[in-house]
Amino acid sequence: MKDTYEVILLGAGAGIRFGAKENKILLELNQRPLYDYALSVFLNDQQCEQVVFVVQEMERLQIQHQVRNLYGSLPEKLTFVAGGSERQYSVKNGLAALNDPENGQVMVHDAARPFIDQEMVNTLLDAVKVEEAVIFAIPARDTIKVVRNQEVHQTLHRPVIWQVQTPQAFKSRLLIQAYERADQEEFVGNEEGELVERLNHPV
């Protein structure tokens, strides 16, 4: 069983929900681009074999220039690929760049989420070896209602509602299979765990 993994780092979002005029991963936090807080964790982790950084094509050169300034050169295990029109298509592009799609393990993380550390990575890596599909989530604190046509249709039972976060981790072949199924059914989901759930595989 492999003790290593690859990671797809998603940075091709437009920052619409955040309300930013530019891609939020390019914003600086303590004089570092936001994406570097996650990128540095994976680059410094010897268990990580490859970082597939999914970026907007028009921002690729800018980010590569920043990375050179941060690390002296482009790290050997860092690969850039272009993002898609939706998160799902960006992850799909990242999956196509994996070195070991058959027997490896892959994590997916949002580059705009800086609060990641080695302990989180280790926890996921240990779990995915056994469970094949694992995610981080926190209990919902707000009451969630289903609304249709401006009218409340249902109030969800808060104790069973969890807010999903990243990183997430999967056996690479399992996540690829989930994406192939989604393509066949022309289904676009919210995040990776949802696609794996559609295979009736526990997450």
Predicted ranges, named:
Residues 2-61:
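N-terminal glycine-rich phosphate-binding loop and ensuing alpha1 helix
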